């Protein structure tokens, strides 16, 4: 089961990580001063990621 985990870092900021069903962390967030802000970011990702495009910047030329 994939899941978001919210936690507090050593500085007291709230962060989240997205974990795969095998327990591997797929990505983690920046720090947020308020827990509500971290929750809002998670909800935004859930709402907006399904239709997101993948842009490969390694193939672009200047």
UniProtKB/Swiss-Prot annotation:
Segments crossing the lipid bilayer: none
SUPFAM superfamilies xref list: YegP-like (SSF160113)
Entry-linked Gene3D superfamilies: YegP-like
Record-stated family: Belongs to the UPF0339 family.
Name under which the protein is recorded: UPF0339 protein Atu0232
Species annotation: Agrobacterium fabrum (strain C58 / ATCC 33970) (Agrobacterium tumefaciens (strain C58))
């Amino acid at each position: 089961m994939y899941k978001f985990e919210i936690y507090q870092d050593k500085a007291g900021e709230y962060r989240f990580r997205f974990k795969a069903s095998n327990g591997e962390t797929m990505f983690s967030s920046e720090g947020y001063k308020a827990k509500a802000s971290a929750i809002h970011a998670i909800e935004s990702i859930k709402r907006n990621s399904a239709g997101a495009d993948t842009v490969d910047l390694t193939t672009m030329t200047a």
